[in-house]
Amino acid sequence: MRWPIFIALAVILFVLGNMAYYGGWFGGGPQTSAPAPTDGGPPPSSPGEPVADGGAEQLPDEPVPVEPQEPVDTPAPDVPEPVTFDHHPAGDLIAKSGSGYLDRTVWSPQMCFPFEEAAFANSQVYGPGGGMGPADKPSQCDPSNYSLPWRDNFCESRGYSSPLCANGKGHQGQDIRPATCKKDIHWVVAAEDGVITDIGTYTVTLTGSAAPHRVYRYLHMRMTQLAVAEGAVVQAGDRLGKASNDFGGTPTTIHMHFELRAGVAGTSTDGKAVMVHTFLPPYLSLVAAYDRKRAGGVCQ
């Protein structure tokens, strides 16, 4: 009876020994899991496991995030070109035609442009076809007279009294040619609300209703076809007449001479401050008015 007992004990010891060995009870057998760390750090990676990159672990059922796309450059909105046109600076007269007045004041800032259509400010005397114009360009209809840039001719050499000009004499206004070299076609209009205070042999005078009561004088319209009479009340933009070449008994070139007068502060010969009602350079007021016209502005 001892042999069976002995064999049974041997089998039990054999099984327990294997369990102890493979289970690592005594530190000698293989381990199926990493031992717990003893220094508080993370457990070492088991062979075959991916090395962590320090980021959050992606779970299998989570959607794969879309890679960020390059930012799309949104084009900047178009900036409109400033509304202007080609013109010489104020006071820049044709060479040898006189000394221009270099004033930068817009004396009539809300003035209505005095033509219904496009027009060209330049010199009718020193330009082609004028009495002092270039000999090689004898025609007043020369294309250069009807193209940009504009040119100032206030204070151009003349014998007329004009206190702001050198020696107190010079051209009293600005010459403006109509859209084409044709007379009695293109309408001239009122520069502001006012009254027609005088009609002369070849002049029409408009006095503004509002202070400072500027005075505008128009020359060389077709005087037999005027749209207004002396004493008429007009609004800015109202038709006055058509550009022509009336100049008494001697016709001039086809153009409209435009003057601006108003009271300005001055000093008398004995040093006293006075108000002087005199001719003022209209060029920059015309430039500003033409800019508004080209931009679609209406006379008010």
Label each PLM-derived region with a short phrase.
Residues 28-74:
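Ser/Thr-rich, Pro/Gly/Ala-heavy low-complexity intrinsically disordered linkers and tails
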Residues 137-157, 216-221, 267-292:
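Short amphipathic beta-strand/extended segments with alternating polar/hydrophobic composition
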Residues 1-11:
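N-terminal Sec-pathway targeting helices
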Residues 161, 183-230, 249-259:
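Zn2+-dependent peptidoglycan hydrolase active-site motif and core
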Residues 17-33:
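Hydrophobic single-pass membrane-insertion segments
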Residues 75-203, 236, 292-300:
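Surface-exposed, glycine-biased beta-strand/turn segments
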Residues 52, 177, 207, 219, ...:
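Residue-level detector of conserved, well-ordered beta-strand and adjacent loop positions
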Residues 176, 232-300:
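Conserved, short, structured surface segments that act as functional micro-motifs
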